[in-house]
Amino acid sequence: MAKNLILWLVIAVVLMSVFQSFGPSESNGRKVDYSTFLQEVNNDQVREARINGREINVTKKDSNRYTTYIPVQDPKLLDNLLTKNVKVVGEPPEEPSLLASIFISWFPMLLLIGVWIFFMRQMQGGGGKGAMSFGKSKARMLTEDQIKTTFADVAGCDEAKEEVAELVEYLREPSRFQKLGGKIPKGVLMVGPPGTGKTLLAKAIAGEAKVPFFTISGSDFVEMFVGVGASRVRDMFEQAKKAAPCIIFIDEIDAVGRQRGAGLGGGHDEREQTLNQMLVEMDGFEGNEGIIVIAATNRPDVLDPALLRPGRFDRQVVVGLPDVRGREQILKVHMRRVPLAPDIDAAIIARGTPGFSGADLANLVNEAALFAARGNKRVVSMVEFEKAKDKIMMGAERRSMVMTEAQKESTAYHEAGHAIIGRLVPEHDPVHKVTIIPRGRALGVTFFLPEGDAISASRQKLESQISTLYGGRLAEEIIYGPEHVSTGASNDIKVATNLARNMVTQWGFSEKLGPLLYAEEEGEVFLGRSVAKAKHMSDETARIIDQEVKALIERNYNRARQLLTDNMDILHAMKDALMKYETIDAPQIDDLMARRDVRPPAGWEEPGASNNSGDNGSPKAPRPVDEPRTPNPGNTMSEQLGDK
């Protein structure tokens, strides 16, 4: 930044000097008005007058000098001067030099060209590559000294590591494979959800292989100029040929490798040209021996089939979400840099985090360390890991949000309805935690934690989920009446409706329609796929689908209503527990469902005489209630956005 400022200052000084030297020179001496000059001529005080256009340099008889200017053409001036014996000297007008004329005429164009070059250099990354380097590859070559990641830093994806380990062995000992006639795959495509470690695995390959490693993003190819993408692909492979054997890693390849065909607008032509060049370079007329292309994407469905065929990306490595054993290994890798308390058990944390990716687990360990740092602790304990898990799963607490007692009570009934139905219906995930503390965008959260990694779901389990989703709305309706039901169940209704529609149209859970696929692909339109969609069902079939979805919803809605009506004592008791403790866990829910006195949550400190429930002791055991409580008109708009 300082160098650029100095450069511009030097340029400004030079330009000012040039204009100063090429500009008209100012006359030395004082200036006198023309009338005074004429008066002195008439008084015979002037000895010499040098006339240069309208400027007159005057020398008086007493040797004083001054300059005056003729305001208008005066035809009598010359006669008057000669009459008074004034020496008249004529001087030619001052003309600029040829160099100055050329410079002044070309300066605006040169300035525009200079500004254009400056901005082009800035767009090329700071001006270090030259103004015409658009077609040069942006791939960065990393040497073995720059990459410290190894397979020891990658955990939770043993099968994927075994697949890519062959690449490393080939690069180290190619003769071992060649003598048996084997050929190493030219390309490996790593596929998996976001955060599962695809890029980390590529770094580990580079660290283990000890060969040059070129890395580039799929979005670095296509830019504002036509032909830049294809040129960069050619240049990248030219560089790789010079450094072979080597590895090229293309992250997020779906940015440039999407399926060719009709798309939106005409901008896809440049991307297709780039893709065509990549197809030729990977397996075209000229071979690229010793170059292995590794790519990563989380959208393999949009890639062009020609890119996925053998000879280009021969092997697809699925890097999926880790299972419980993989999560434990990942946690141990990230825990190596954190001082841990003796009570830390990675296996317990792994069992409580189903569905977490490697990035989620890394974030979990980091959040736990931050919680410990806020508490001025020297080690990280299980308490911090529980707080971190709740924050990631349910959102950050918003204790500063002001809620009235009526809103808290409505939220407590809503969340209690979810929890009770979740405990009473079959095959439902266990209730892990219920809270009325606002978290994220929700005023309250009921969190269900699966006991293991979910692979598939039965029809009974899905219907239980629908019943549980409507438990919150039904609790409000039963307690306060239909006219006081809030909008807090909007997200629950959306999720339940989508679940029921999928059961009918995709999973064959309708006796009337049978095991047929009725759902149309509803993915977003993207470049490389046709915009037009064909209709695959008649209007009558669509009407039957709507009827089946509605019947499925109503059946589970009525089941949830009956369960809540039969357990009103538990509903009121759970509301009281939530109003007092704000957050209850599985042990408190077990006490409530067993109609026992509720034990305080772990770490609970009695606040004294003041508490939300108006009772200093623990909430009492549920007791049968014959009539619903009086509706509270102050909670008609309690919004639990995304409360489940």
Swiss-Prot record:
GO terms for biological process: protein catabolic process; proteolysis. (Microbial infection) Activity against phage lambda cII protein is inhibited by EDTA but not by PMSF. In vitro pre-incubation of FtsH with HflKC abolishes its activity against phage lambda cII protein at the cytoplasmic side of the membrane. GO terms for molecular function: ATP binding; ATP hydrolysis activity; ATP-dependent peptidase activity; metalloendopeptidase activity; zinc ion binding. It comes from Escherichia coli (strain K12). GO terms for cellular component: membrane protein complex; plasma membrane; plasma membrane protein complex. Binds 1 zinc ion per subunit. Residues 598-644 are annotated as: Disordered. Changing residue 418 to Y: In tolZ21; loss of protease function in vivo, retains about 25% ATPase activity, temperature sensitive. InterPro entries: AAA+_ATPase, AAA_lid_3, ATPase_AAA_core, ATPase_AAA_CS, FtsH, P-loop_NTPase, Pept_M41_FtsH_extracell, Peptidase_M41. ATP binds at residues 192-199. This is ATP-dependent zinc metalloprotease FtsH. Its EC number is 3.4.24.-. The record marks 225 as: Substrate binding. Keywords: ATP-binding, Cell inner membrane, Cell membrane, Hydrolase, Membrane, Metal-binding, Metalloprotease, Nucleotide-binding, Protease, Transmembrane, Transmembrane helix, Zinc. It comes from the Bacteria. Disruption phenotype: Lethality, due to increased levels of LpxC, which increases the level of LPS in the cell and results in formation of abnormal membrane structures in the periplasm. Lethality is suppressed under conditions in which LPS synthesis is reduced. Disruption confers resistance to cellular contact-dependent growth inhibition (CDI) CdiA of E.coli strain 536, E.cloacae strain ATCC 13047 and of Y.pestis strain A, but not to CdiA from E.coli strain 93 toxin.
